[in-house]
């Protein structure tokens, strides 16, 4: 059975690119913001990995990361953060909260796939 990845990004084009590169090896679900992600998790869904943009309307990705890492049921799920901002302080802040990786947009989709495979070995 394929491992499940949840993508949180308000840009559908980014989600589609990620899905194209990941769907051959993983079951991919896309939602447009962190609040939808919270609702999806609370409905009983548990992905093996979450890839989340930071800047989204509604619940931002950094707020979602804080929520998930404070929630006993979900804190074990690894989260990769995506950002258009190449900021050392932002990267360090998110890694301290509990992100397993921080990838700057634009990114190479193949590189992201390699990073995902390191986190979710098959």
Feature names for model-found ranges:
Residues 12-29:
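Two-component/phosphorelay signaling modules centered on CheY-like receiver
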Residues 32-49:
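Acidic, metal-coordinating helix/loop segments flanking the phosphotransfer/catalytic sites
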Residues 107-116:
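C-terminal output helix
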Residues 15, 57-58, 66, 75, ...:
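The feature encodes the CheY-like receiver
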Residues 31-37, 91, 109:
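Conserved Asp/Asn-Gly motif in the active-site loop of CheY-like receiver
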Residues 53, 83:
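Active-site residues of response regulator receiver
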């Amino acid at each position: 059975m394929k491992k499940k990845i949840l993508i949180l990004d308000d840009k559908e084009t980014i989600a589609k690119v990620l899905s194209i590169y990941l769907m051959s090896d993983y079951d991919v679900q896309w939602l447009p913001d962190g609040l939808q992600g919270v609702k999806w998790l609370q409905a009983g869904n548990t992905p093996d990995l979450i890839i989340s943009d930071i800047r989204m309307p509604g619940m931002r990705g950094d707020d979602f990361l804080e929520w998930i890492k404070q929630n006993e049921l979900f804190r074990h799920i690894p989260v990769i953060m995506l950002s258009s901002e190449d900021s050392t302080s932002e990267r360090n802040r998110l890694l301290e909260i509990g992100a397993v990786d921080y990838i700057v947009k634009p990114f190479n989709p193949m590189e992201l796939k390699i990073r995902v495979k390191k986190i979710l070995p098959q």
